[in-house]
Amino acid sequence: MTTTKVRPTESFGKIIKFFHLISSLVGADVADENYRVNIITITLIICIVAYFIFTGTTVASVFSENWTYLLEASCMVGSVLQGITKLISAFAFAKEILGIRIELENLYREYEVKGDDYAEALNKSCERVWQVIKMVFLMHFMIPGIDVDTQVGYLMTLTLHTMCFLFGAFGLFAGDLFFLLFLGQPMLFLDLLVLKVKSLNEAAAENSSNAERLLIEIIEWHQYYTDYNLRCNRIFYYINSMQIVTSGISIICTLYIILLGDWPGAYLYILVAFGGLYLYCIMGTKIQTCNTAFCEELWNINFYDLEVKNQKMIIPILMKAQNPSEIKVGGFLPLSVQTALQITKTIYGIFTMMLRFLEENQ
C-alpha cells in the first residue's frame, strides 16, 4: 500500500485556511482579498470600548476602598493593549499582509515543481509552522448600575466578561498566528538557499554555462530575503514593542498581586504573560540564528570554481550578509532571548524590592 505525498501548496493552504478561520472569528481577516468590516468587527470594537469604560469606572469606585484593585485590573490591561495593537496593525498594514500571503503562496507553487528536495524543504517549513502554533494555544470590571449580587446582574456581567474574554483570546491568537507564520518563513528561505548553493557548486565544478544564471538567482534570493525581513520588521514593529513592554508590566503587577494573595487567577495569568514574552523573543532569536546561517551558507559557495567576473559579483553580497537586518523592539533592542533574560532580571530586581516593601509594612 503506497501513501500519497502531500503537496507543499496543499500543506500551506491548510495553514492559511486555519488562519482565515481564526481571524474571521474576530472580524479581522485582512489576509482575505474580499475582506470587509462586518458586524463581528464592530462587536469586537464595542467590547474593547466597553472593557476600558467599565474597567475605568470600576477602578474609580473601588480605588478608595482597595487600591490593590487597580493592580488587579492593570494585569489584564496589558493583554488588551496587545490585542488593540495587533488589530490596528492588521488594518494599517492590510495591503502588506495580503501581499506577503500571496507572495508566499506563489513561492510555494513555484518551488514545489523544482524537484523532491525543494518539495521536502517546503513541507518541512509547514511542519515547523504547525509545531510553533501548537505552543500558543475572569476580568476585573463591573457594569455601572448592575448589581452583581443579584442573579440577573451576575449573569449579565458574566456574559459581558465572557464575550470580552473570547474576543480577546481569539484576537490575540489571530495576531500571534500571522507573527509566527511570517517570521517562520526565513527558515524556509535558508533551506532553499542551501539547495541553490548546491546547484551552483555542481554547475561551477562542471564549468557549466548555467553557473552565472544560478549565481544571479542566489544574489536575487539574498536581496529578497533582506527585503522580506525589513517588511516584517515594519509590519510587526508596534506589535513587538507593545508585546514586550506590556508583558513586562503585567508580570510585575501580577507578582505583586500574588504576594498579596488577592487574586487566585494571577498564578495562571503570570504563566500566560511569561509565555507571550518568551514566545516572541524566541522567534526573534530564530531569525538571528537564521541570519547567521544564511551568511555561512553564502560562504559555502566554491568561490575559486567561479569565473573572475562572477567572483566580483558575489563579494558585495557576502559583505551585506555580515550585517543583516534584525527584528527590533522599539527600534533599538533586538527581539531575542537575551533581551527577554534582561527583562526577567529587571523583573526579579523589582520583585525583591516588593518583598522588602511588604516586610517593612508588616
Regions found by a protein language model. Name each.
Residues 93, 100, 118, 186, ...:
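Alpha-helical interaction elements in eukaryotic regulators
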Residues 2-74, 106-183, 188, 195-213, ...:
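Helix-loop-helix junctions within predominantly alpha-helical proteins
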Residues 76, 80, 96-99, 103, ...:
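Charged, amphipathic alpha-helical oligomerization/scaffolding segments
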Residues 73-99, 168-185, 277-286:
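Hydrophobic alpha-helical membrane-embedded segments
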Residues 130-134, 336-343:
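Individual transmembrane alpha-helices with interfacial aromatic-anchor signatures
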Residues 283, 341-360:
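Membrane-helix cytosolic exit motif
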Residues 153-157, 176, 196-265, 269-290, ...:
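Multipass alpha-helical transmembrane domains of eukaryotic endomembrane proteins
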